[in-house]
């Protein structure tokens, strides 16, 4: 099953996150199928590729709770 979830990146104590599509059994920092955007919680910077996100949602990918909340704020879902 595909999941749209956050993948941690960045330096220690200066984290940022990539929004990626992964198999639900893969590790958090495992290999992603595709990168859909990024989020930096420190600077509140976000980028979401809406076309790719909608494509994977139509294919049946389930967003995690955090990603679901991000998509709700961006009015994608």
UniProtKB/Swiss-Prot annotation:
GO cellular component terms, A-Z: chloroplast; mitochondrion; small ribosomal subunit
One matching Pfam family: Ribosomal_S16
Protein name as it appears in the record: Small ribosomal subunit protein bS16c
Origin superkingdom: Eukaryota
Bilayer-crossing regions: none
Cellular location(s): Plastid, Chloroplast
Additional note from the record: Although originally identified as Cyanidium caldarium, these sequences derive from Galdieria sulphuraria.
Cited InterPro entries: Ribosomal_bS16, Ribosomal_bS16_CS, Ribosomal_bS16_dom_sf
Organism, as annotated: Galdieria sulphuraria
PROSITE patterns documented for this protein: RIBOSOMAL_S16
Stretch forming the signal peptide: none
GO biological process: mitochondrial translation
Gene3D superfamilies, alphabetized: 3.30.1320.10
Coiled coil residues, start to end: none
Keyword Chloroplast in record: yes
HAMAP family, sorted: Ribosomal_bS16
Keywords: Chloroplast, Plastid, Ribonucleoprotein, Ribosomal protein
